[in-house]
């Protein structure tokens, strides 16, 4: 076991505070509409330019191990806020720095750290309650666009695009962000259910120009196992041919002979057919096939249900108004499933999302939910250079997370106004213990930090802005840093999701409380590298030995 370096009390807190300041100072310059960019060196390729707080925080590692511990604890604030709310990481970092700074001063003045933490927690709970009271539900698509615009640093085009996507796919729908090959940024809405499996043979193509197989009013056969021969389903195929409708076969795999027979029938024109592999793997594949069965009003042909392939009749098949299959994806539009059954399935998936502890499982369940409940929208981000595209993609992802948070818990006045107004709620708290009261006062002062930083990044004196906003008793009155004027924030569309503001404060108070109560720090001593050995002499030439 290697030797350790141990620091105590004031020495430990001072070095930790230096680390907190280095990280927070790098992150907080990005806050607000006039926040600056941070350029990050990459080990390969061009440097990355970003205004995303958590991206900056994740890149910072300090040489001094004690300073680095302080920095990493604040980085944890940004990461936690990002995981929970998807935005507000810079606000959380600014709040954490403000609470830690004041807390360290109070401890140095001889106050009890545990009582200080108790006070910080009491005040944080009061702010959370106050934000919950102030939050107003998102009533219109215009408000969704406003939230998106604010979170993407005033880019109205991004705000409108996200609002358009959310309107189309609903709040449960999946919206993904991809890089575009062109200069344009656009939205592609996929209606119906899409899964990432394409046709098994190009001979199934019906539209040679687009290289897609399009089946109108199709029957859909869903089979859990491999199809190695068609003997068992010949009566079914004959019934489908008589109906004159096309058929989509979805199975684990369709092997050589069966596939060749389908292709020959397709080319001869007797049977309009296409075949694709089932999406997913293992248990997830079965669940996705059941989703498709419920969406199309069909039945999954599975041994578990005791249904043999030879006993399948036409009324067991799913139906859809249209199926479009390309080389990589299959899209089922307007399935004939009963609304009641689909809603029950959606409820079941939501319950699984609540219960799961795995982030990966949660993500996959949410994708399934979206495909059943809403649809899928893809925002393709374009730009002149790769650096620009990456920077814009960061902002689009932030804006998307913020709008989702706004839909969940409502909106509050933006620009740090909601936190500043929460001072009134914290100011009402009185505690007999002076150290607990000092903890409450630390949060009271820290609530000014975000609006001060937004103002200072815009080149305006923060104290003057705080004073003017507090002078006016209108709850929604605040400072528009973009135009450097005092306005009604909600009327101007400068709004923040309540969830983002709440999470930022909770996470900042939680980690800052731990930092304040730190009394000792333990780090590994840096290892001394041994000096490299002398290279071999190898004799001197020309000496004649």
UniProtKB/Swiss-Prot annotation:
Keywords: ATP-binding, Chaperone, Cytoplasm, Isomerase, Nucleotide-binding. It catalyses: ATP + H2O + a folded polypeptide = ADP + phosphate + an unfolded polypeptide. Its EC number is 5.6.1.7. Its main location: cytoplasm. GO terms for cellular component: cytoplasm. ATP binds at residues 30-33, 51, 87-91, 415, 496. Transmembrane segments: none annotated. It is found in: Cytoplasm. CDD domains: GroEL (cd03344). InterPro entries: Chaperonin_Cpn60_CS (IPR018370), Cpn60/GroEL (IPR001844), Cpn60/GroEL/TCP-1 (IPR002423), GroEL-like_apical_dom_sf (IPR027409), GROEL-like_equatorial_sf (IPR027413), TCP-1-like_intermed_sf (IPR027410). GO terms for biological process: protein refolding. Gene3D superfamilies: GroEL, GroEL-like equatorial domain, TCP-1-like chaperonin intermediate domain. NCBIfam families: GroEL (TIGR02348), PRK00013.1 (NF000592), PRK12849.1 (NF009487), PRK12850.1 (NF009488), PRK12851.1 (NF009489). Together with its co-chaperonin GroES, plays an essential role in assisting protein folding. The GroEL-GroES system forms a nano-cage that allows encapsulation of the non-native substrate proteins and provides a physical environment optimized to promote and accelerate protein folding. HAMAP family: CH60. Belongs to the chaperonin (HSP60) family. This is Chaperonin GroEL 3. It comes from Nitrobacter hamburgensis (strain DSM 10229 / NCIMB 13809 / X14).
């Amino acid at each position: 076991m290697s030797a350790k370096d141990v620091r105590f009390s004031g020495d430990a807190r001072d070095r930790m505070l230096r680390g907190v300041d280095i990280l927070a100072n790098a992150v907080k310059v990005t806050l607000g509409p006039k926040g600056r960019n941070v350029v990050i060196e990459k080990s390969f390729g061009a440097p990355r330019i970003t205004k995303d707080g958590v991206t900056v925080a994740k890149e910072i590692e300090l040489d001094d191990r004690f300073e680095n511990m302080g920095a990493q604890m604040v980085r944890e604030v940004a990461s936690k806020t990002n995981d929970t709310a998807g935005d507000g990481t810079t606000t959380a970092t600014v709040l954490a720095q403000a609470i830690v700074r004041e807390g360290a001063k109070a401890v140095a003045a001889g106050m009890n750290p545990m009582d200080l933490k108790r006070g910080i927690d009491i005040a944080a709970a009061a702010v959370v309650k106050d934000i919950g009271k102030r939050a107003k539900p998102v009533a219109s698509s215009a408000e969704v666009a406003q939230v998106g615009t604010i979170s993407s640093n005033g880019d109205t085009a991004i705000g409108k695009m996200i609002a358009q996507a959310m309107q189309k796919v609903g709040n449960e729908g999946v919206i993904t962000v991809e890089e575009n090959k062109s200069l344009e940024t656009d939205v592609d809405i996929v209606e119906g259910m899409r899964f990432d499996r394409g046709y098994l043979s190009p001979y199934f193509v019906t539209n040679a120009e687009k290289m897609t197989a399009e089946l109108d009013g199709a029957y859909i056969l869903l089979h859990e196992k491999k199809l190695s021969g068609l003997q068992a389903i010949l009566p079914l195929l004959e019934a489908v041919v008589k109906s004159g409708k096309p058929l989509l076969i979805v199975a684990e795999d369709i092997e050589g002979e069966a596939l060749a027979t389908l292709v020959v029938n397709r080319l001869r024109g007797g049977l309009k057919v296409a075949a694709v592999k089932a999406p997913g793997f293992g248990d997830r594949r079965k669940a996705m096939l059941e989703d498709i069965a419920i969406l199309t009003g069909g039945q999954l042909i599975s041994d578990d249900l005791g249904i043999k392939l030879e006993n399948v009749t036409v009324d067991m098949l799913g139906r859809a108004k249209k199926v479009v299959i390309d080389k990589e994806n299959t899209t089922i539009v307007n399935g004939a499933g009963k609304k009641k059954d689909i809603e029950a399935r959606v409820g079941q998936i939501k319950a699984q999302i609540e219960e799961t502890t795995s982030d990966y499982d949660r993500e996959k369940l949410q994708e399934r939910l979206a495909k059943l409940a809403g649809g899928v929208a893809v925002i393709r981000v374009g730009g002149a250079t790769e650096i620009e595209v990456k920077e814009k993609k960061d902002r689009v992802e932030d804006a998307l997370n913020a709008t989702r948070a706004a839909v969940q818990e409502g909106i509050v006045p933006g620009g740090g106004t909601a936190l500043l107004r929460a001072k009134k709620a914290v100011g009402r708290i009185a505690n007999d213990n002076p150290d607990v009261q000092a903890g409450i006062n630390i949060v009271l002062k820290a609530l000014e930090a975000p609006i001060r930083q937004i103002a200072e990044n815009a080149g305006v004196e923060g104290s003057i802005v705080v004073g003017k906003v507090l002078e006016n008793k209108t709850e929604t009155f605040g400072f528009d840093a973009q135009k450097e004027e005092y306005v009604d924030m909600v009327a101007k569309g400068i709004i923040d999701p309540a969830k983002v503001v709440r999470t930022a404060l909770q996470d900042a108070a939680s980690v800052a409380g731990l930092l304040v109560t730190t009394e000792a720090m333990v780090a590994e001593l840096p290892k001394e590298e041994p000096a490299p050995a002398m290279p071999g002499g190898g004799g001197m030439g020309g000496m004649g030995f």
